[in-house]
Amino acid sequence: MASTESLEALAAELATANDLELLQGAADLQRYSKDAYDYSPILQPQLASCRADLVVRPLSVAGVERLAAACGRHGVPLTLRGSGTGNYGQSVPLEGGVVMLSGALREVEHLDPSTGVVTVQPGCLMRDLDQHLRAHGRQLRLLP
C-alpha cells in the first residue's frame, strides 16, 4: 500500500498531464475497483474491501507510459482494467493505488496480411476488431 504522501504527489503530477483523465470521486473509486468477482462466494468476502485510491483513464499510448512511469517513481501500485467483465478479481486493486482504465484506447493498429497477426490497443472492443478483420477477408475465430 502506498503512503498518503506518495499518492498525493502522484495525483498532483498526473493532474498536469493533458492526456490523462483523473477520477477521484467515491462512486468512481468503488465502481472501478470491482469486477464480477461477487458471483463467487469465496472471492466476494476476500475482495469486497479492496479499493483504488485513484482511477486514471489515459487518452493516448503516451499517457499510459506517463502513468506507468509516474506510478513506478512514486511507488504506487498500478492495476490494469479492461471492461471489468472478468469474474476472478483480475482488475481489483488488491493493495490500493491506481486503477488504469483502458477504454479510451480502442484502435486496431495493424493487421499483417501475410500472417494474420493483429495489433490492437488495450481497450479495443471485440466487435470493432471483428469488423476490421471482416473488411480484410478474415474473421476472429477464437475470443482471447
How would you name each of these model-derived features?
Residues 83-90, 124, 138:
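Gly/Ser/Thr-rich helix-start
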Residues 80-84, 102, 122, 144:
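Glycine-rich, histidine-containing beta strand-loop boundary motifs that form or position
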Residues 107-114, 119-144:
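FAD-binding subdomain of flavoenzyme oxidoreductases
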Residues 1-72, 85-116:
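N-terminal flexible segment immediately upstream of the FAD-binding catalytic core
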Residues 22-24, 80, 142:
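A structural preference for short, hydrophobic beta-strand core positions in alpha/beta folds
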Residues 76-77, 139:
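Residue-level detector of anion-binding/catalytic polar loops
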